Amino acid sequence: MYGQNVRNVSYYPPYGYNGYKQSGERMWRMSHSLPSGMDTDFTSSYPGPSAMNPRGRGGYNDFSGGGSAMGSMCNMAPAQSTNSLNSGGDGGGGDTQAVNGTNLIVNYLPQDMTDRELYALFRTCGPINTCRIMKDYKTGYSFGYAFVDFASEIDAQNAIKTVNGITVRNKRLKVSYARPGGESIKDTNLYVTNLPRTITDDELEKIFGKYGNIVQKNILRDKLTGRPRGVAFVRFNKREEAQEAISALNNVIPEGASQPLTVRLAEEHGKMKAHHFMNQLGMGPPAAPIPAAGPGYNNMVHRGRQNKMRNHKVHPYHNPQKFI
């Protein structure tokens, strides 16, 4: 117990993130919507080269192991994806910006998944430069998506073919190329509620498709029954198209629905979720401190007490001079 040598454990940045800055603002500045890893599909952007800082395989421990439960994951046949976003090099939606052929974004991660598990899952597909699950640096709350940067484009392409669509702890993973950030793809993801509980992908496309090119759409479904929950995410190719859809459909009852839709940016929905989560943990914004009283206040109180004693008339029965 006492007297034993205790190893000094210092903080190590996550895999490949020597220059990682613990800043909440860094998260909110990213063009994808925060933090809705439970539902939202983040495919809009990834951290730039200065944030990724790849070090190569020399700086990593191999967590996969021969006996890992995920050791043969890349030999599994992926389920057929129902997502409209192609996982090819176009980055989805015909965006003119080039994509990084080695950097992937992984969506719909289990809430309790760790960096080690994610690394073991993708390491079987090839050497990895960087691998990180995006989390709130204060609470550790997982946003449900991650970036994985492979050493070669062939390994990244293999990871998309083999891991995309598989189920991990009741979560169906979505793996695709991460698109570089830019002003043209910010604020393009919409969060839609009050949809009919019988809505299909084609009906969702019919409602929103008239306002622009839909890059991706995802109807959230009940885990047990598989029926729609009345909630969906719709990502447009341009910000202007998303804003037009908000103006045209928010608080409007579409054909076949019984209540008006709520359409807003997914980023706003993510911030509301994060604020609610922080309040549940008792980590909301601190109350404003009570200002300390200055010396002038103390002097005023002291003078008031002196004047009160000076003008106070003592009752005759309580006057000690009467009994002398």
From Swiss-Prot:
Cross-referenced Gene3D superfamilies: 3.30.70.330
One Pfam family recorded for the sequence: RRM_1
InterPro entries given in the database record: Euk_RNA-bind_prot (IPR050502), Hud_Sxl_RNA (IPR002343), Nucleotide-bd_a/b_plait_sf (IPR012677), RBD_domain_sf (IPR035979), RRM_dom (IPR000504), Sxl (IPR006546)
UniProt GO molecular function: mRNA binding
GO biological process terms on file: alternative mRNA splicing, via spliceosome; sex determination
Tissue-wise expression: Expressed in somatic cells of both sexes throughout development, but not in the pole cells which are the progenitors of the germline.
Source taxon at top rank: Eukaryota
Residues covered by the RRM domain: 102-180, 188-268
Location in the cell: Nucleus
One GO CC term on file: ribonucleoprotein complex
Sorted UniProt keywords: Nucleus, Repeat, RNA-binding
PANTHER family: OS02G0815200 PROTEIN (PTHR48025), RRM DOMAIN-CONTAINING PROTEIN (PTHR48025:SF1)
Primary role: Unknown; apparently not involved in somatic sex determination.
NCBIfam families assigned to the protein according to its UniProt record, in alphabetical order: sex-lethal
Protein name: Sex-lethal homolog
Species this protein is from: Musca domestica
